[in-house]
Curated annotation (Swiss-Prot):
Cited function: Involved in ciliogenesis. Regulates cilia length through its interaction with MAPKAP1/SIN1 but independently of mTORC2 complex. Modulates mTORC2 complex assembly and function, possibly enhances AKT1 phosphorylation. Does not seem to modulate assembly and function of mTORC1 complex.
Organism field: Homo sapiens
Gene Ontology biological process terms, A to Z: cilium assembly
Disulfide bonds: none
Annotated protein name in UniProt: Coiled-coil domain-containing protein 28B
Length: 200
């Protein structure tokens, strides 16, 4: 029977000193915490504190260069832009101004002369050119397929098909030239602005 009691009783760990059976281990707790925490119950840090401990642990693990640090070697690195309230207010004001400019249409894309309306115009021209280009390809493929299926050319005579294809190609080239000119104007306006700033 004594052997069974010995087997059931927990064995004290060799690394920990043996404590008297009736004593509780007291954990020092600040007075701001509730009284129930002073009984030795485990106290888990809040998620905010855990993140802080992780951050401090990571910063301590970072190697410090011999002549590179401006602060002392024992102080953790801090991001001043996260703690400066005036910087946050300044960024907030800048973002609100940007949002107001966007809604009013005054927002400039590349310079004073280049607005989003011009960029929208260029984008629409690009889409129009792409549609025209692919519609020409599709029309050409459909006509070739019809000729192969029928064995005989139906519809328009060859000369009319050729003149229509030439007209579509001329339209495509003129639209492409307009697009090129619009993009060139945007680039010229963008390059002219830094020259004006350097001259002033």
């Amino acid at each position: 029977m004594d052997d069974k009691k010995k087997k059931r009783s927990p064995k004290p760990c060799l690394a920990q000193p043996a404590q008297a059976p009736g004593t509780l281990r007291r954990v020092p707790v600040p007075t701001s915490h509730s009284g129930s925490l002073a009984l030795g119950l485990p106290h888990l840090p809040s998620p905010k504190q855990r993140a802080k401990f992780k951050r401090v642990g990571k910063e301590k693990c970072r190697p410090v260069l011999a002549g590179g640090g401006s602060g002392s070697a024992g102080t953790p690195l801090q991001h001043s832009f996260l703690t400066e309230v005036t910087d946050v207010y300044e960024m907030e004001g800048g973002l609100l101004n940007l949002l107001n400019d966007f809604h009013s249409g005054r927002l400039q894309a590349f310079g004073k002369e280049c607005s989003f309306e011009q960029l929208e115009h260029v984008r629409e021209m690009q889409e129009k050119l792409a549609r025209l280009h692919f519609s020409l390809d599709v029309c050409g493929e459909e006509e070739d397929d019809e000729e192969e299926e029928d064995g005989v050319t139906e519809g328009l005579p060859e000369e009319q098909k050729k003149t229509m294809a030439d007209r579509n190609l001329d339209q495509l080239l003129s639209n492409l030239e307009d697009l090129s000119n619009s993009i060139q104007k945007l680039h010229l306006a963008e390059n002219a602005e830094p020259e004006e700033q350097s001259a002033a």
